[in-house]
């Protein structure tokens, strides 16, 4: 009981003395794009170049409308950068922060994890298809000419690939036994 009380006392002292104010650390001299003069200059120069090209065409013509759409898309893109909280460098370009901070997770961490999930999904579905086809009579032919029902079944199994991989790894089915691995006689 004394140890529990002492632990609670130490934890409460630690919590009370910890400063938990939000801190905004300077990230390699980057500033928010909404406050960057170089970012605004880049927007102005980009749209001005497009507007100069637009003056060469008659209003309402196909090239003029295409350039106007490009100007609108450029302004929308810069507005997204400005409003998303991205940080810009001295060149006025947005920079992605990849240091693992949760405040910048949307820039690199979440897309990276999504990429790994999709790559694993494709690999697991392909592996499942090849294993299912290997048990059939015409396995070589089915590797070239895809059997759609088997492929759809394999793809449906692929959505839960992280759980299936963990299950197969823990059961030992995912990895080869030591006896199955050949050793070079060198």
UniProtKB/Swiss-Prot annotation:
Q: Which residues cross the membrane?
A: 105-125, 144-164
The keyword Transmembrane belongs to this UniProt entry's keyword annotation = yes
GO BP terms = photosynthesis
Q: Which InterPro entries match?
A: PSI_PsaF, PSI_PsaF_sf
Q: Which GO terms describe its cellular component?
A: cyanelle thylakoid membrane; photosystem I reaction center
Q: Which Pfam families match?
A: PSI_PsaF
Q: Secretion signal: which residues?
A: 1-25
Its record classes its membrane topology as:
Multi-pass membrane protein
Residues in a coiled coil are none
Annotated localization: Plastid, Cyanelle thylakoid membrane
Is the keyword Chaperone in the record?
no
Q: Which UniProt keywords apply?
A: Cyanelle, Membrane, Photosynthesis, Photosystem I, Plastid, Signal, Thylakoid, Transmembrane, Transmembrane helix
Q: Which domain of life is it from?
A: Eukaryota
The UniProt function text for this chain reads: Probably participates in efficiency of electron transfer from plastocyanin to P700 (or cytochrome c553 in algae and cyanobacteria). This plastocyanin-docking protein contributes to the specific association of plastocyanin to PSI.
The similarity annotation says: Belongs to the PsaF family.
* PANTHER family per record: PHOTOSYSTEM I REACTION CENTER SUBUNIT III, CHLOROPLASTIC
Stated name of the protein: Photosystem I reaction center subunit III
Which source organism? Cyanophora paradoxa
The upper taxonomy is:
Eukaryota, Glaucocystophyceae, Cyanophoraceae, Cyanophora
Gene name tied to this protein: psaF
């Amino acid at each position: 009981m004394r140890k529990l009380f002492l632990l609670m006392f130490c934890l409460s002292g630690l919590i009370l003395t910890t400063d938990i104010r939000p801190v905004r650390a300077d990230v390699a001299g980057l500033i928010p794009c909404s406050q960057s003069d170089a970012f605004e200059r880049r927007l102005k120069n980009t749209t001005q170049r497009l507007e100069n090209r637009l003056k060469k065409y008659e209003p309402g013509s196909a090239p003029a409308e295409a350039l106007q759409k490009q100007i609108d898309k450029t302004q929308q893109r810069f507005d997204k950068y400005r409003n998303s909280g991205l940080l810009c460098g001295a060149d006025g370009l947005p920079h992605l922060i990849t240091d693992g901070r949760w405040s910048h997770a949307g820039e690199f961490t979440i897309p990276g994890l999504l990429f790994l999930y999709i790559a694993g999904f494709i690999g697991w579905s392909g592996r499942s298809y090849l294993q299912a086809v290997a048990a059939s009579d015409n396995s070589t032919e089915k590797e070239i000419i895809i059997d759609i029902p088997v492929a759809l079944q394999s793809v449906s199994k692929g959505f839960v690939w992280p759980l299936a991989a963990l299950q197969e790894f823990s059961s030992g089915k995912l990895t080869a036994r030591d006896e199955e691995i050949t050793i070079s006689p060198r």
